[in-house]
Amino acid sequence: MAGRTPLTPVLSRFWDDPKSWTFETYREHDGYRALATALNMTPDEVLQTVKESGLRGRGGAGFGTGMKWGFIPQGGTGPAAKPHYLVINADESEPGTCKDIPLMFMTPHFLVEGAIIAAYAIRASHAFIYVRGEVVPVLRRLRGAVAEAYEAGYVGRDIGGSGFDLDIIVHAGAGAYICGEETALLDSLEGRRGQPRLRPPFPAVSGLYACPTVVNNVESIASVPPILLNGVDWFRSMGSDKSPGFTLYSLSGHVTRPGQYEAPLGITLRELLDYAGGVRAGHQLKFWTPGGSSTPILTAEHLDVPLDYEGVGAAGSMLGTKALQIFDETTCVVRAVGRWTQFYEHESCGKCTPCREGTYWLAQIYDRLETGDGTSADIDKLLDISDTINGKSFCALGDGAASPIISSIKYFRDEYVAHVEQQGCPFDPRDSMLVAPEGAAV
């Protein structure tokens, strides 16, 4: 494709190195130079630099990272007198979302260096990295990287002779998707059942152990060292005015070359598909998710939507985690959304009635539609229950369950009707299966 937006490998630029995860390899690629720059600045100057860069949270909401850091009270009285904590949300668990795990596995020192700089900026002496417990190889890599940083003197007492002390703790979660919600994550870190907290107070004032806390996504923190190293103007030269910089787009599903594609914010799915070899041979795009299973689905008519926070929002969806799940015409949209609904029903923490009861009944209706027992009233009932959940649950899990249902009925209502009229799914699930080519390595 002529004139397509170029890829911008920054966090992924040396993933192909034989030992990309090691301290030595990271140092060969300017590793920990950004930390030296930060330690020659005041914490407030580091915070201001991140603010000016326009870096937005890469975990879904897109809130300004520097602005979030700035909410931490500073001074010697009230909440400001308490210890400050940095918590990194590495509990990546949503269907389709798969950027943080390869980032931590291939280049964990980006995250470690970013955590040190972020902790310095908010004046925290303890940082916690909360990792999904099932990804044991990632846990081992990350703990190894932290140990290397301790050994090199980048973590611990009096880092770089600056008088700054920091301890980093890598904590394994127990597999609950709800712990990806920042306040549920804090409860889990404190040893309690992970459930969302009532806000206010917000974590910036009363977070971990009732102390001022910043909770950031893995990619958000890992993006900080390149900004400190290369400057604000370099970062803002990529992306758009309101959504500057680079990010990882995760392509999966019916695409020729699935994987991570690092590009400026604002690139389009058409361009990314071109880099990825297009939809699998002999098929065409039917629908896709811009930010994982919790975001409203989009269709082929949205191929040229800029993949930044404003562009995707204007199209009626959310950029979210940039998990681009690609589905071709062989896919039953009812089955796909039904599987996501089962996930949200299973992962609901049960704290609030709309989500606990709503996701249960949504899953029952999808089961009826697939087995041929559905009625036309069930389609309207799906919308009715989704409306009851959307915006009325205690946290965003309920919204995530409702969004793909509402959007799928908007774009593919005829498919739902076909399930009722034909008393079951008219699609053969074998057609949409992805089979490894003969001779492929496992």
Region annotations inferred by a language model:
Residues 139-265, 277:
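Hydrophobic alpha-helical positions that pack around
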Residues 65, 93-96, 134-139, 176-179, ...:
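Flexible loop/turn segments at secondary-structure boundaries
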Residues 267, 279-280, 288-294, 343, ...:
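Active/binding-pocket-proximal capping segment
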Residues 1-193:
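Iron-sulfur-cluster electron-transfer modules
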Residues 36-79, 237, 250, 262-263, ...:
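Accessory "access/gating" subregions that flank catalytic or transport cores
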Residues 33-52, 76, 82-84, 90, ...:
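Ferredoxin-type iron-sulfur electron-transfer modules in oxidoreductases and energy-metabolism complexes
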Residues 110-114, 247, 336-339:
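Well-ordered alpha-helical segments embedded in enzymatic catalytic cores
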